[in-house]
């Protein structure tokens, strides 16, 4: 797997992970244009994007979720409470592209297994993710403020 941080910090968070034939964005808290341009600087494209995973509902994590979902017909994964608190900010997303899960649930996105886990943050139901493909693992944890 390959990990690219497109942006991190209070100005916006956006992470891109690719593995074999799978493309995943974790958080899209920058403009869609900026995310696409930053990824292109790394020689990558979001064409064929398989999933957008959301850690929590703060705007610096969801700004372009709707734009990227619509442009690339990508499903958006979020916990139920996160989805309920973010849906009015992301615009219209196809019903079949809304994927709600419970913290602790394991998701399958093509050939990548995605573990979800609770994190500490001032959001309604924040999560971190561990992506596993073969013997490779990448974990993404944001905005925790302390090691838990």
Residue ranges and their predicted role:
Residues 1-42, 127-143:
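Conserved beta-strand hairpin/beta-sheet module of binuclear metal-dependent hydrolase folds
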Residues 53, 115, 140:
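Conserved Rossmann-like nucleotide-binding pocket used by diverse enzymes
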Residues 7-8, 28-30, 57, 81, ...:
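Active-site metal-binding loops of divalent metal-dependent hydrolases
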Residues 7, 51, 99-102:
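Beta-strand->loop->alpha-helix junctions that form or flank phosphate-binding loops
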Residues 80-135:
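Metallo-beta-lactamase
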Residues 32, 62, 86, 126, ...:
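Short, well-ordered alpha-helical microsegments
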């Amino acid at each position: 797997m390959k990990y690219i941080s497109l942006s991190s910090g209070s100005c916006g968070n956006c992470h891109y992970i690719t593995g074999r034939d799978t493309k995943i964005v974790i958080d899209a808290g920058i403009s869609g244009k900026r995310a696409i341009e930053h990824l292109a600087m790394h020689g990558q494209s979001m064409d064929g994007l398989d999933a957008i995973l959301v850690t929590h509902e703060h705007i610096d994590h969801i700004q372009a979720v709707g734009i990227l979902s619509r442009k690339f017909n990508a499903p958006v994964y979020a916990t139920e409470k996160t989805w309920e608190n973010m849906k009015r900010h992301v615009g219209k997303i196809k019903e079949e592209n809304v994927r709600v899960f419970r913290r602790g649930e394991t998701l399958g996105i093509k050939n990548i297994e995605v573990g979800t886990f609770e994190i500490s943050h001032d959001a309604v139901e924040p999560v971190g993710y561990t992506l596993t493909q073969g013997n490779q693992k990448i974990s993404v944890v944001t905005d925790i403020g302390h090691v838990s």
